[in-house]
Amino acid sequence: MKFFVYNPLLKTASLNIKVKAAAKSNDIKEFIIINDVLHLKLSIKAHAQQGKANEEIINFLAKEWQLLRSNLEITKGHTNSLKTILIKNIDEEYLNLILKPYIK
């Protein structure tokens, strides 16, 4: 199974995530399978109200993965716990490196 979809021409990747809002702490768990699709499981402290959790997802992932906030965009699932994130300006090798700890 693919953990992400990478476009080498644009240097972008799409990554599915499953978010638990209003958690005790911000944390990245592991990949889980939902409806035969791999999702990276996240816990976020912010509540899912008025886009606060979405904003915290971007801030948290940018900090954790040492990426610019502007290179992360939620493209699907703005009002759902299942989301798709577009990561821009990233090498596939670096993406594999940052995702490796979450692959069990």
From Swiss-Prot:
Gene3D superfamilies noted in UniProt: YggU-like
InterPro entries: DUF167, YggU-like_sf
Lineage: superkingdom: Bacteria
Listed SMART domains: DUF167
Family statement drawn from the similarity comment of this UniProt entry: Belongs to the UPF0235 family.
NCBIfam families assigned: DUF167 family protein, PRK01530.1
Protein's name in the database: UPF0235 protein A1I_04385
Species of the source: Rickettsia bellii (strain OSU 85-389)
